[in-house]
Amino acid sequence: MQPTLSTAPDGTRFRDLNGNGVMDPYEDPRLTPEERTADLLARLSLEEKAGLMFQTVIELGDDGDLLETPGAISKSPTSTVILGKGMSHFNVHHIPTARAGARWSNNLQRLAEQTPHGIPVTISTDPRHAFVENTGVAFSAGPFSQWPEPMGLAALDDLEVIRTFADVARQEYCAVGIRAALHPQIDLPTEPRWGRQAQTSGYDAERVSQITAAYLEGFQGDALGPESVACTTKHFPGGGPQRDGEDAHFPYGREQDYPGGMFEYHLAPFREAIRRGTAGMMPYYGMPVGLERDGRPIDEVGFAYNRQIVTDLLREELGFDGVVVTDWELVN
């Protein structure tokens, strides 16, 4: 069932998302997002709530059609994950043309309108405005404008260029229905052998903090709004000090060392991201080794599972109240 544009008795126009002929509070455009969300949550089943807690990879069909077979990476048909599993957050991979991207996004939203409460889909993406083509890390620009990698942008040493890039990328994302960015990556690569440096902005904590502020301003604006692209900043609390330069995507690269009290140095850009209102935060796959804060040992447990890191530090000490997004397939 597709929702209809209806008129309430008082003349308010609204979209009847659940098709019951009544303007329920979550459909009332006059209410705040918080009020509408509270009403919607009270209507959802446990299964529907569970579906909203996951985000998976999704792929386009030919020329923007919905892919109804398993893809190269996505494991289920599109209708299965939306109508069957109640999922509404997806990380899009290859987009061949802007037309296909926009057409696919519209098709996806029309499918989501058939769910019991008409919850729209949120599409996210890894960086896709530069040259690197490495699935799970970044995509080359393709139909989007092409810019230097983040390390190259940082090397220009011009915050206005960073802000302009982010604003242009925001507009291009919105044009094809992408409203969430799985970036910026603000890790400080203090281990020069680490293989994920190209998507960082270097190892100067103060300068990276300034770049982060400009980046978030370009994508999100002064505050999240209808024209924003919501950013998920990564990889909390800093994914750069990888032991021997290995990477935590692999079991042999999970250890992160902070010699000489460098943990706070790596944390500095994330403090700025929180101050600037980043919508999301992504912990890394890695785990701290031999780390103490204020004389208290930090458990040698993966950051995304680490209560001392996610709850005590990120939520309580730093006051982050946005969405925590785990890195991909943390549980599989």
Question: Which positions does each model-derived feature cover?
Answer:
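Glycoside hydrolase catalytic-domain context in secreted enzymes
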Residues: 1-332
